[in-house]
Each structure stands twice: as structure tokens, then as C-alpha cells.
Amino acid sequence: MAKIHLYDHQLEALEKMSNGCILCGDVGTGKSITSIAYYYTKQGGKVNTDKYVWMKKPPKDLYIITTARKRDTFEWEGELAWFLLSTDPEVNAYKNKVVVDSWNNIGKYVDVENAFFIFDEQRLVGSGAWVKAFYKIAKKNEWILLTATPGDSWMDYIPVFVANGFYKNKTQFVNEHVVYNWRNKNYPQIERFMNVRRLIRLREKILVDMVFERHTVRHVEDVYTTYDISAYKEAGRSRWDPFKDEPITNASGLCYVWRKIVNSSESRQTALLEIFE
């Protein structure tokens, strides 16, 4: 049975993670598998061992709230499989419930209790329906957030700060940290933030960065091919599109025909196939 293997940067992040944290990493760093590994180890599993270590039975139900695209393309299913987990009860090796759904449906899970939630592609901004549902879920369950882009403004952190109990609500946060410019009474603008040191400490408490240095070497090789020079010159002379059998009316149309003549060359296609062999 396959063991669970994490890379060094993923292990470092795993050791720093805690309930209510934000796992931050670029695309390709492995946030998904690291987040499931956190759930897996919290439920008794172990990573980087000689063989698969079973979680306690039954482990907590697992809910993954992600984008509709990731749900529909089953991206998370591939990561779950390493841990013998599946949204299909007949495939899942455990008796717990595993759900992968989109942010649009987060309201369906506000009554769930004593489960574990992974919120992927963090969409918690403002005070709309998603944020309200998130607050209800966070009170009764364990949870973590995944993002490639941490908040641009301190206001973006309000939902996570409130859910972690740092502030009672948005009003308290605003009263303690936000100074508005009221020149336009209908649309006040944030002028500055107060007590930023506290905000930095709170952010450092919950933000887990996945530091991953890519050690790759770029390889460039020029491959020279031929094309139909006579057809190329004829298109420029006659301003006639041989593919659509109609006149070329502008410069962009001529450039399109020239590119197509070059790219459709049999010599070019053969060279491309040889690269993939």
C-alpha cells in the first residue's frame, strides 16, 4: 500500500499549520496535498513512513470548498486518492463523509458540526453570504484556508481574524484599526490603519508560507525548418488569402496568412513530432 510522501517544503509547512491558519503558496507548491496531509495527521495518520498509516476510525468528515472548475474537473479527487479517501462511499476506504463542492454552495453546510473543512482559493472578502456562512461553519468545525494570493489590504483579513476569535466582529476591527477619510460622506475612503504592529503579529500567527525554490535549468535548442517560400511571396504580392479564397483587406490579415503558411509547413510539423518522440 502506497505511503504518503511530502517534500521538504511541504513538511515544513505541515509542522507550522494549526486550526484556522492560511496556507499560502504559489501554484505548483502542493497546497492541496499538504492540506489533506494536515487533516490526515490530525486524524492519526503519518507521512513519510515506510508504509501507509491508517487514520483512526472513523476520522472526521471532510469538506472541501473550492472553485466550481476544480470540483467539476475532479482535481481534488486525485489528491484524496493518495490518502485512500474519496467522495464516492464505495471507493472511500473509511466510513467518513468526504464532500467536494463549490463556494456557491457553501450555505448548504452551515449546520455541519465536528467536521474538518478545507477552504480552497480563499474567497472570503467583505461581509456577504459566503462570509456569513463561513462564520457559522468555523464556530463548529476545524478548518484551514488555502490561497496563492494573501490579502492585499488588512480589510481582507477581517473574516479570518474574526473566525479565529481575534475580534468579535468587523465593527470592532474597524473601530480599533481603521481611520476613514470622510470628504465624500457617501463613499468614505480608508485613509490609514492604526496599531499595524498588532495586525502584523496576528497575520504572522495564522499565515503559513510554503517556501519552495525551483532548481530548474532552461534548455533552448533552435530547430530550423523550411516552408513554401513561393506561396509566402505570392500572398504578399497578390494580397489573396489561399485558405479562405478571398482578398486580404488589411495588414493583420496578411500577417495571419503568412503565419499560417509557415506553421502549416510539412517540414515544421515533422520537426515538432520528432521533438516529442
Task: Kindly label every feature range from the protein language model.
Residues 67, 80-113:
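Inter-Walker segment of RecA-like/P-loop motor cores
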Residues 60-61, 116, 133-215:
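Conserved P-loop NTPase motor "coupling/switch" region that bridges the ATPase
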Residues 32-39, 47-82, 151-156:
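Conserved Walker A/P-loop ATP-binding site and its immediately adjacent core
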Residues 1-24:
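Conserved pre-motif I regulatory segment
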Residues 19-38, 147:
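Walker A/P-loop
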Residues 120-122:
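Walker B catalytic acidic pair
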Residues 18-23, 60, 142, 277:
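Pre-Walker A (Motif I) flank of P-loop NTPase domains
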Residues 213-277:
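Conserved helicase/translocase motor-coupling segment
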